[in-house]
Swiss-Prot record:
<keyword id="KW-0999">Mitochondrion inner membrane</keyword>
<feature type="transmembrane region" description="Helical">
    <location>
        <begin position="178"/>
        <end position="198"/>
    </location>
</feature>
<keyword id="KW-0812">Transmembrane</keyword>
<comment type="function">
    <text>Component of the ubiquinol-cytochrome c reductase complex (complex III or cytochrome b-c1 complex) that is part of the mitochondrial respiratory chain. The b-c1 complex mediates electron transfer from ubiquinol to cytochrome c. Contributes to the generation of a proton gradient across the mitochondrial membrane that is then used for ATP synthesis.</text>
</comment>
<feature type="transmembrane region" description="Helical">
    <location>
        <begin position="347"/>
        <end position="367"/>
    </location>
</feature>
<keyword id="KW-0408">Iron</keyword>
<keyword id="KW-0472">Membrane</keyword>
<dbReference type="GO" id="GO:0008121">
    <property type="term" value="F:ubiquinol-cytochrome-c reductase activity"/>
</dbReference>
<keyword id="KW-0349">Heme</keyword>
<dbReference type="InterPro" id="IPR027387">
    <property type="entry name" value="Cytb/b6-like_sf"/>
</dbReference>
<feature type="binding site">
    <location>
        <position position="201"/>
    </location>
    <ligand>
        <name>a ubiquinone</name>
    </ligand>
</feature>
<dbReference type="InterPro" id="IPR036150">
    <property type="entry name" value="Cyt_b/b6_C_sf"/>
</dbReference>
<dbReference type="InterPro" id="IPR048260">
    <property type="entry name" value="Cytochrome_b_C_euk/bac"/>
</dbReference>
<feature type="transmembrane region" description="Helical">
    <location>
        <begin position="77"/>
        <end position="98"/>
    </location>
</feature>
<dbReference type="Pfam" id="PF00033">
    <property type="entry name" value="Cytochrome_B"/>
</dbReference>
<dbReference type="InterPro" id="IPR030689">
    <property type="entry name" value="Cytochrome_b"/>
</dbReference>
<dbReference type="GO" id="GO:0005743">
    <property type="term" value="C:mitochondrial inner membrane"/>
</dbReference>
Length: 379
């Protein structure tokens, strides 16, 4: 008798995706982040669902409904902080996942990579709208500043901003629609993640060497299921430690003050995972230029496959490219730090130099270095 998991229409899909999937035998722990992102998404959807049962998307009651969740709902504080810090874990895994893709040349799977970039945009949009919902000072002013950027678009800019606001300022209509979008987007992300996996399984996984692994495959279960479970346990350990010991360490104290349109906070800044993009935005004095740079800082990822000039896929055997990769990582950390600093000397010039270096590295220096390395190989 044939095994049910290989014949049943639904089980067959699960089987070919998570059980009998042929996987390269040499993939390292850097390949754990895909499954960790799946776990993060499930945690966010579940905690978000329970929060939505008690939250009210009205400017008069939003802030107090979050307070009510933390004070009066059974384990409401736990659900709220799991959701808030779960977002941070989500972005840590996302950045490491993208970094892995850049390091090992996984971007050569074009469809998978492009859907990944789309997923990154969707997660960033979801996180931004989620940050607005508690209706604290930073929620309100963050929403005002970021949505106002759209007014830089010629001709339709100001109309577009008012259309998004649903009025002449960030108000009840804005909060209600942000809540609606924040609720629906994670399900769209889950669907996109399914398509992401579909395209990945068309080609099979990449591996650290960047070479074809067709000659040496092992079944996903039990080898990588066990490996993924270890990753999940470590993720949960870090998340629970964060939630139970220092739940507010990544948040902003200003968000514990109810939103007040008449009082601007001294330093408006987004959550830590947007600071690198925020620093790039601020480093350009022109409004439209800043908005374009902000969008390009993420869109540039979609250009990476077309800038691949090396004969080797991975940079595992390319020392110069490795150095440049880690300079890029250091540059992004610098941008993240600058994004959280006030707009004054010397932070302005550091931010501008780091922004220029970011685009130069990806668009110019790394492709040229790849060609140079190939030529050095001929010597």
């Amino acid at each position: 008798m044939t095994n049910l998991r290989k014949t049943h229409p639904l089980m067959k899909i699960v089987n070919s995706s998570f059980i009998d999937l042929p996987a390269p035998s040499n993939i390292s722990s850097w390949w754990n982040f895909g499954s960790l992102l799946g776990v993060c998404l499930i945690i966010q959807i579940l905690t978000g669902l329970f929060l939505a049962m008690h939250y009210t998307s009205d400017t008069m009651t939003a802030f107090s409904s979050v307070t009510h969740i933390c004070r009066d709902v059974n384990y409401g504080w736990l659900i709220r902080y799991l959701h808030a810090n779960g977002a941070s874990m989500f972005f840590i895994c996302l950045f490491l996942h993208v970094g892995r893709g850049l390091y090992y040349g996984s971007y050569m799977y074009l469809e998978t990579w492009n859907i990944g970039v789309l997923l990154l945009f969707a997660v960033m949009a979801t996180a931004f709208m989620g940050y607005v919902l508690p209706w604290g000072q930073m929620s309100f002013w963050g929403a005002t500043v970021i949505t106002n950027l759209l007014s830089a678009i010629p001709y339709i800019g100001s109309d577009l901003v008012e259309w998004i606001w649903g009025g002449f300022s960030v108000d009840k209509a804005t909060l209600t629609r942000f809540f609606a979008f924040h609720f629906i987007l994670p399900f769209i992300i889950a669907a996109l993640a399914g398509v992401h996996l579909l395209f990945l399984h068309e080609t099979g996984s990449n591996n650290p060497s960047g070479l074809s692994s067709d000659a040496d495959k092992i079944p996903f279960h039990p080898y990588y299921t066990i490996k993924d479970i270890l990753g999940v346990l470590l993720l949960i350990l870090v998340l629970t430690s964060l939630v139970l010991f220092s739940p507010d360490v990544l948040g902003d104290p200003d968000n514990y003050t109810p939103a007040n349109p008449l009082n601007t906070p001294p330093h408006i800044k987004p959550e830590w995972y947007f600071l690198f993009a925020y620093a790039i935005l601020r480093s350009i004095p022109n409004k439209l230029g800043g908005v374009l740079a902000l969008v390009l800082s993420i869109v540039v990822l979609a250009l990476v496959p077309f800038l691949h000039t090396s004969k080797q896929r991975s940079i595992m055997f390319r020392p110069f490219s490795q150095c440049l990769f880690w300079i890029l990582v250091a540059d992004l950390l610098t941008l993240t730090w600058i994004g959280g600093q006030p707009v004054e000397h010397p932070f302005i010039i550091i931010g501008q130099l780091a922004s220029i270096l970011y685009f130069l590295l990806i668009l110019v220096i790394m492709p040229i270095t790849s060609v140079s390395e190939d030529n050095l190989m001929k010597w």
